[in-house]
């Protein structure tokens, strides 16, 4: 206990140097903490939103764009596909369930999604207030939508054409307002930031604005489209043959969410590697700074350390003072770094929420964070080894020699 207390006092005998070392090491650890949290929370968010969706079928174009627009709702869709073509897939022996998704409108930047009740069942989300829609032009809104927009059960609103995050600039469908009949409980899934309604609602909104007469209305009904379909397989073996079937025999494309998200994460990983390298440079710089500080401390305290040796302190205890001092630095920097990393993650989550993007943020302590104190320990001990060895070699005779001189 005395060694620990002495090391603490030695550390703060030079407060500016100690504070700078803690800050420098803490910044490196904060960067590592932030990267680990981003990776963990993004992976969890994608897992929640992609769970149980084996393939997405939509208009031809970019497969990644199809996944980002239809599952994560982060991009514009590749186009629409005929309703008849999607219905034809329902009879395919490898298809267990199809969930149609129709996009095109939004409210204050939040997307209005035409679908069926299976969409809610798929994610297992429960109603917090109100009831499910039972007819067109009724909507159930996500928890984040309700919180940010102020909409309540019974409120009416008109959608805006387009999926822009600003929610402005598009045509407002004032002739066909929606009525809020339910609010979903917060689930942490993509449903938190969506307004869900029957597919017929989306058709009705656009047919009302487009049809000039009854004949036009009939033609539009015969040519109805959806944006895409979320599909579950009857067997995992379908992943080999079903996408090829869709891509080669229809005018649509099939994209596997797991494959496209892996590609996305690998692309994002390039930027992550740069940040990780930057954090590594910070840690190396911090280690060098700690080494210089401890080495200087040994030089400055050499007479005092020699006095301790003359008073009977063993060499191991003298060296331990330097090692414990380094451990104090590691402990303080770890606390600072992990708190700063959590704060940065919360700030990122808040910013993404404002952009109606992926739901991340909040306090999380994944097992990967154990790497942070381990890194701090390695850097501190590596920096303290040579100074500790120098302290170990201090002899009581040095004090006598300096006194005789």
Ranges and model annotations:
Residues 172-179, 183-272:
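Mechanotransmission and gating elements of multispan inner-membrane complexes involved in transport
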Residues 36-111, 118, 135, 242-246, ...:
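Hydrophobic, regular-secondary-structure patches
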Residues 335-374, 385-398:
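Short helix-loop junctions at transmembrane helix boundaries
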Residues 106-117, 125-213:
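Hydrophobic secondary-structure segments that place a key small or acidic residue at a functional site
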Residues 282-285, 295-297, 302-349, 379, ...:
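Transmembrane alpha-helical interface segments in multi-pass membrane proteins
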Residues 11, 309-316, 394, 403:
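Short helix-to-coil transition segments within interhelical loops
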Residues 1-33, 323, 404:
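N-terminal Sec/SRP start-transfer signal
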């Amino acid at each position: 206990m005395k060694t620990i207390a002495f090391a603490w006092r030695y550390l703060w005998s030079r407060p500016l140097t100690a504070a700078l070392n803690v800050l420098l090491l803490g910044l490196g650890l904060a960067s590592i903490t932030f990267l680990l949290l981003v990776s963990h929370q993004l992976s969890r968010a994608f897992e929640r939103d992609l769970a149980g969706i084996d393939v997405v079928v939509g208009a031809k174009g970019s497969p990644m764009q199809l996944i980002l627009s239809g599952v994560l709702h982060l991009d514009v869709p590749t186009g629409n596909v005929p309703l008849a073509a999607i219905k034809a897939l329902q009879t395919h022996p490898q298809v267990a369930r199809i969930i149609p998704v129709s996009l095109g409108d939004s409210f204050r930047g939040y997307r209005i999604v035409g679908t069926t009740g299976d969409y809610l069942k798929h994610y297992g989300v429960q109603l917090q207030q109100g009831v499910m829609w039972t007819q067109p032009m009724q909507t159930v809104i996500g928890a984040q939508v309700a919180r940010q927009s102020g909409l309540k059960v019974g409120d009416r609103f008109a959608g805006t054409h387009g999926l822009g995050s600003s929610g402005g600039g598009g045509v407002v469908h004032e002739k066909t307002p929606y009525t809020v009949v339910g609010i979903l409980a917060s689930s942490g899934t993509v449903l938190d930031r969506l307004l869900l309604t029957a597919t017929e609602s989306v058709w009705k909104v656009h047919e009302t604005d487009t049809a000039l007469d009854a004949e036009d209305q009939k033609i539009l009904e015969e040519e109805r489209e959806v944006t895409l379909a979320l599909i579950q397989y009857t067997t995992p073996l379908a992943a080999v043959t079903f996408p090829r079937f869709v891509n080669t025999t229809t005018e649509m494309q099939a994209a596997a969410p797991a494959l496209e998200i892996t590609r996305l994460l690998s692309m994002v990983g390039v930027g992550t590697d740069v940040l990780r390298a930057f954090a590594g440079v910070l840690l190396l710089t911090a280690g060098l700074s700690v080494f210089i500080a401890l080495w200087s401390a040994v030089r400055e305290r050499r007479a005092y350390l020699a006095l301790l040796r003359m008073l009977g302190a063993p060499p191991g205890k003298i060296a331990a003072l330097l090692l414990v001092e380094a451990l104090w630095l590691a402990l303080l920097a770890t606390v600072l770094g992990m708190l700063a990393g959590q704060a940065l993650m919360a700030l990122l989550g808040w910013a993404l929420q404002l952009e109606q993007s992926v739901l991340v943020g909040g306090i999380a302590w994944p097992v990967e964070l154990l790497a942070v104190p381990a890194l701090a320990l390695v850097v501190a001990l590596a920096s303290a080894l040579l100074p500790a060895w120098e302290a170990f070699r201090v002899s009581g005779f040095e004090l006598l020699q300096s006194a005789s001189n």
